[in-house]
Amino acid sequence: MDSVKNILLEYGLRFQEPQIEKVDKYIEELLGVPYNLTAHRDLDSAVHKNVVEILLPLKEELKGTLLDVGSGNGVPGLILAIFFPKLKVVLLDSREKSVNFLRGVIEKLDLGNVSAVKERAENFSRERREEFDYVTARAVARLNVLVEICTPALKTGGKLLFYKGPSYIEELKEAQRAMKELKVELEEVREYSLKTGERRALLILRKYESSPEKYPRRVGVPFKRPLL
């Protein structure tokens, strides 16, 4: 079984030793929690899914403030906080068990640039409008829903970083109304593949104008009645 360090070296990813130590501890925590929090039962799978998949498409240094919506086990926000220490990261999740797990990991890894918050994305985005340089999410919802619940918290000129699978093309077509309503435009799609054979895409959307105050709609509505 490959080590975290060797797997990252295979992909040519750059890192410092303290970052590898933190990832090692994180993966240990991840594999030690009940499997309803994570589907990864071995190191190789966990590193590919939770570390390589997040870092591989990033070409630039991230700094400023970042919100991870529906953070779950901490991906992508926690990984980005480890490898981009100039980021100040908020991990947002509505489930108490996820937030408790995240707070435990933050303490064990001594991550001073990360906090975990228990709240619904619709409420948080409404309360913290125009606050973040980046908002990211993975495996939370379809793109049209993500655009509505994430964009209000993003600064004008800020970027949405959404990790998607091969179906992103269909989701992009479906999200045109939401993108227009929330005032974001597609800046770039970065397609990439893992050595496990999985195909992925990082969608980068830029907010060009403040989102209307009526968004996001109240809790649950963006999921039940998405903008189409």
UniProtKB/Swiss-Prot annotation:
Record protein name field: Ribosomal RNA small subunit methyltransferase G
Similarity comment: Belongs to the methyltransferase superfamily. RNA methyltransferase RsmG family.
Main location: cytoplasm
Function per UniProt: Specifically methylates the N7 position of a guanine in 16S rRNA.
Keyword match Transit peptide: no
UniProt cross-references to Gene3D superfamilies, sorted A to Z: Vaccinia Virus protein VP39
InterPro entries named among the record's database cross-references: rRNA_ssu_MeTfrase_G (IPR003682), SAM-dependent_MTases_sf (IPR029063)
Natural source organism: Thermotoga sp. (strain RQ2)
EC numbers, comma separated: 2.1.1.-
Compartments it resides in: Cytoplasm
HAMAP family assigned to the protein according to its UniProt record, in alphabetical order: 16SrRNA_methyltr_G
